[in-house]
Amino acid sequence: MYKDNGFTGFKSVESLLNDKSVLPEVPGVYIVIRDQKTAPVFLKIGTGGFYKREDPNVEISTLQANWVETSKIVYIGKATSLKKRIGQLLSFGDGKDVGHRGGRYLWQLADSRNLQIAWKATPNETPREVERQMIQEFKSAHGGMRPFANLQD
């Protein structure tokens, strides 16, 4: 489904932490996918970094309330450079003090290292507009809920 829409990559967080060279240095959007058949296990303390000394962790009840059972997409993001922004997301998830608090719920998933990231270049469109449209389409398909780790439209 996502491949038909121009997304490429589909690399695990674990593999991208080991080799970010596959990430393109172009503007675009990216999605984070949890392709597991089992229910998610939420961690009280995740692996996210404490950017500006702010605790990235939230209550498990908050994570449960935001979980979208009917979707494999758990986050939609935008980037002026996919390599840089996805790199920041990965570094934040690896506990670094990096400015990527968006998506922080991802790192309270017990299987966060198995999440997959796919990306799509948007050479003729503004990444923010594409992201906004994708989130709106997601909300329409999922009863008004955003992807699990998207905290704003």
Regions found by a protein language model. Give the residues of each.
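GIY-YIG nuclease catalytic motif and its immediate N-terminal context
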Residues: M1-K84, I117-I135, L151-D153
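Positively charged, low-complexity intrinsically disordered regions
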Residues: D35, A39, G102-Y105, G143, ...
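Generic, ordered loop/turn and secondary-structure boundary motif
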Residues: Q64, V68, G87, W107-A110, ...
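General helical secondary-structure elements
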Residues: S81, D97-H100, H142
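Aromatic- and Lys/Arg-enriched surface recognition patch
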Residues: G87-L115
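Mid-sequence acidic-hydrophobic segments that form the walls
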Residues: L89-F92, E137, A141
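Alpha-helical oligomerization segments
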Residues: K139-D153
